[in-house]
Amino acid sequence: MADVSMRQMLEAGVHFGHQTRFWDPKMRPYIFGERNKIHIINLEKTLPLYKDALNFAGRLASNGGKILFVGTKRPARELVREHAARCGMPYVDHRWLGGMMTNFRTVKHSIARLKDLETQAEDGTFDKVTKREALALSREREKLDRSLSGIKNMERLPDAMFVVDVGYEHIAISEAKKLGIPVIGVVDTNCSPREVDYVIPGNDDAIRAIELYVSGIADAVIEAKQASSHAAAAGKDDFVEINDTAS
């Protein structure tokens, strides 16, 4: 697992919360104090909780579990897309469509339509229709791709959800809770941690802080997958060796 230090969190600005007048009292246990009317998050609480989240993500990944990365606000989009793709996990980086999880069966039809349009674009079908029809198909494809490209290879509901800003993504979290999907969430001082299973108290606006969270989860997933793969290969070698001895 990637070794993250308190110094790295400080340098990334993880400890900076929101203005004190916007705070959520449920975040009181994670707040160190205030400075210039800004709440300061207690990194002595954040660091072990972040490591708990990394361990959970790693355990899931080692067993073949899928974690859906969710970050649709502007500072998070590119980082979520980059690191989710890097570790082979699905993601939502544009806009959370209502019912994306609770009505997943219908969403799968839209994914099938997207894949069909991609095939048509590649095999020359668009060239065989009128310019107006081709333009309409291209626009439909772009719209679906913008919303669904990160989950188009997700065959089933995820085993967990990782959310960068729990306030901004409250609809996604609500759907996850209805379905019993565990949530890993970055929770700033203006949000409630109540619906989050693995709370990461921290700044959810600074790009460096967001990158620390997202890259750390991705690294934990990659390391767990590699360890699982190596263990499986070692077990296979042992099995072959036993057979050879027996013969």
Swiss-Prot record:
GO terms for molecular function: structural constituent of ribosome. Coiled coil: none annotated. The keyword Transcription regulation does not apply. GO terms for biological process: translation. GO terms for cellular component: cytosolic small ribosomal subunit. SUPFAM superfamilies: Ribosomal protein S2. Pfam families: Ribosomal_S2 (PF00318). CDD domains: RPS2 (cd01425). It comes from the Bacteria. Keywords: Ribonucleoprotein, Ribosomal protein. Belongs to the universal ribosomal protein uS2 family. This is Small ribosomal subunit protein uS2. It comes from Halorhodospira halophila (strain DSM 244 / SL1) (Ectothiorhodospira halophila (strain DSM 244 / SL1)). The gene is rpsB.
